[in-house]
Amino acid sequence: MGWGSVLLLLAVALLCQRASSIGANWGTQASHPLPPDIVVRMLRENGIQKVKLFDAEYDTLRALGKSGIEVMVGIPNEMLATLASSLKAAEKWVAKNVSTHISTDNVNIRYVAVGNEPFLSTYNGSYLSTTFPALRNIQIAIIKAGLQNQVKVTCPLNADVYDSSTTFPSGGDFRANIRDLMITIVKFLSENGGPFTVNIYPYISLYTNPDFPVDYAFFDGNAQPLNDGGTFYYNMFDANYDTLVHALEKNGFGNMPIIIGEIGWPTDGDSNANLDYAKKFNQGFMAHISGGKGTPRRPGPIDAYLFSLIDEDAKSVQPGYFERHWGIFTFDGLPKYALNLGTTNTGALIQAKGVRYLERKWCVMKPNVRLDDPQVAPAVSYACSLGDCTSLGVGTSCANLDGKQNISYAFNSYYQIQDQLDTACKFPNISEVTKTDPSTGTCRFPIMIEPYYGGAAREHGFFFPLLMVAAIAVSIF
């Protein structure tokens, strides 16, 4: 081989290194999660080469074995106290959930995520004293296992751990009440080769602030730019990312690698959570990072994981109904919209293969029942409390349903989640089973997939606050 060919190959290799592949968050807070082997095949067929997990479920990690997919395995916040207080517990966790899967199953575990957004202000400091000790003990356990060159620790943090005293990125620093702790953690990560992992959500800014400029959430350059001393920011992502970069620089860690642990846009549950906006945001983000341009303060490739891969119908809706609709795929692995991930697909996501469904039948309201029947309201409240009614209401995919259709949707959600048990469609004299699909327009009345019993398929109980049930019940009528 001539020198010209060698140089060409080196150039191609360097180019590939600069164009970081996109990853995806794979959450499993679902009443009926897809079998892990089906999800892994879907990941591979869509060219998704990195996956971020929120736990270390055995079957999930086994399915990822020999796939070549890079894995970030997660430790839930609820485990931090135990791992912080016991090095032995940390060693057992690493042995069971990291070492074994690497040596026996050939899983490409590259990171351990210790906790998930543990310093959110809404947690009221619950994990302030346990996060760093847990992080330290897991790192010690990784070193004892001889995996420190392959597996790095990190701690996914919400973007609220830093802010700006000037409202501009250049004023970025860590939040005053946790600044010392953040510097301790960042220093520890830096010493051990771990990245700073941050979750950035322009959608949340739009959801929580009615005055937030919509165009600034996207990447098409239509927003009024933010002028930070001659550096112009045309979208919120760049401004937020560079606020973190300035915070790191200000505290002596300007070269620390950054991973975007979560970024995405939901498709339902709110007027701004829809297919058009989700496609616009996610495709815009992919185009924004595809050339390795980076941000004004930190040029270069951006390492990121889309949030999320699949919808999760058992997630808490405390933040909002949209929480169950972040997936680029539906709960059963159907693509929601065209999306070019810059991998092996050309804009058409490939659906999950081998998905097995329950029988094609639905639970609906009997046509002769009146809306003011005294049995209706309590039945709907019950169905929504144990089902998923987050697609009902103003601005949602099922917003155009009439009263009876809304009630039918609630009944069917409960019926499907209960695996179509006969008793799950026995609302007193007001419900019946039909084999005629009641779906209409943008509103899909789902048929549930067969339950998966290989792992902790039903360990996540539904959390649907009564106030939210009441709010949906009001919107139905």
UniProtKB/Swiss-Prot annotation:
Residues 456-477 form a propeptide. Pfam families: Glyco_hydro_17, X8. Coiled coil: none annotated. It is an enzyme of class 3 (hydrolase). Its main location: membrane. Glycans are attached at residues 97, 124, 406, 429. GO terms for molecular function: glucan endo-1,3-beta-D-glucosidase activity. Residues 1-21 form the signal peptide. Keywords: Cell membrane, Disulfide bond, Glycoprotein, Glycosidase, GPI-anchor, Hydrolase, Lipoprotein, Membrane, Plant defense, Signal. Its EC number is 3.2.1.39. One of its GO terms (biological process) is defense response. Contains two additional disulfide bonds. Disulfide bonds join 363-425. It is found in: Cell membrane. PROSITE patterns: GLYCOSYL_HYDROL_F17. SMART domains: X8 (SM00768). GO terms for cellular component: plasma membrane; plasmodesma; plastid; side of membrane. Belongs to the glycosyl hydrolase 17 family. This is Glucan endo-1,3-beta-glucosidase 6. It comes from Arabidopsis thaliana.
